[in-house]
Amino acid sequence: MQRGDLSSKQAEVVVVGAGLAGLAAARALRTAGSDVIVLEARDRVGGRTLNEPIGDGKVVEIGAQWVGPTQDRVNGLIAELGLETFPTHVSGTNIFERGGHLGRYEGTIPKVNPVGLAEVGLLLRRLNAMAARVPPEAPWQAPRAAEWDSQTFASWMKRNVRTGVARDILRLAIIGVWAAEPRDLSLLHVLFYIRSAGSIELLTDAEGGAQQDRVVGGSQLISLRMAEQLGAGVVELSTPVRSIRHSDAGVTVVSDRLTVSAKRAIVAIPPTLAGRVAYAPALPAVRDGLSQRMAQGSVVKCMAVYERPFWRERGLSGAVTSVSGPVSVGFDNSPPDGSPGVLLGFLEGRAAREAMDRSRDERREIVAECFGRFFGPEAAKPIDYVDRAWGAEEWSRGCYGGFMPPGAWTDNGAALRPPIGSIHWAGAETATVWNGYMDGAVSSGARAAAEVLDAIG
């Protein structure tokens, strides 16, 4: 990777964004023999994946990190790049906090009162059945799309959830998957997301689900390896794209320090960021509406570092879900050899928005207090602490991914993927399988590259 000195360049294809989607697209294009340039606003590759050093050559993943079963695209890419995965630590009992009480349980569902537990099971089966009726390539064509897209998940819960326990568990599932509150999300979007993963259990589970495995050396290595394979001069860092002039003849992509002319462009950044680029001629109103309405989730990913994972000695897995918060979900995020010990906690939705206004030291105190509550006094005194407020990131504006509020799928969803002239769209938000996940990002890049190759012949 180099920061080129030229003020202008030409290529067959220009890719905007050097995250997983953009680099996967560029890799596929290079493999097919196309000349490609990738423009990245940040001073690094990886997008919403980022490795954070914690000493002794070890890292923690401060962005997206997990892969799981059925995520064939990203798991295949990991293998192709010579990387390995290791299982998330799940051995031991988990903690569930509600109403000031800490309960311990094994498996995926907390031990709560039988009536509430039975309702949770019934609701999960019902949501899976509803999701099965949503075509992932066109959610707006679901038989009940208009009805489901006219309400929030919160309003659906109000009508269909009877026990407080079930309501609390469903809310934790929602903020844990989308980093948004139930009131923020269209019911249709929730159902689409479940369908794109296969089931709500695949979305929420560790063992056997989306949180099953991690990448040895950190998930950013996937992007770093792809960028290395592309070779010098292909990826231009610190090059935020400001405008795209497009016609049937090609595109001219203008950044702060470089202008690239090409036959085709792949815009591989979240819709909310793609909407901040100036297009000439202007994009259709339905596409503008999509960019304006598809918000990013709100999350602060926090990690406390300890000399050893002492909770394992007490028979605890490190996994926690808390109704009380502000840390709502936590995991053991230690390196493969278990040293040092690392506890991961998420501040999500409303809690994240409140925490982003605080200093890192203040967030450290908040997270340490939560961990002390969950795991005892030793957890309240980490030797190090790292976090990332993704909503404050200029070139992310939130994580984990974009989500649709009521009305957006039925009004604007059809504009999400189709090319507009010589501009193609990629990114985790455009995926039909594992939307919003690293797997979805990789598959979207491959799909956009195939579109371009078909167009340029």
Regions found by a protein language model. Give the residues of each.
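Flavin (primarily FAD) binding-site architecture
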Residues: 267-285
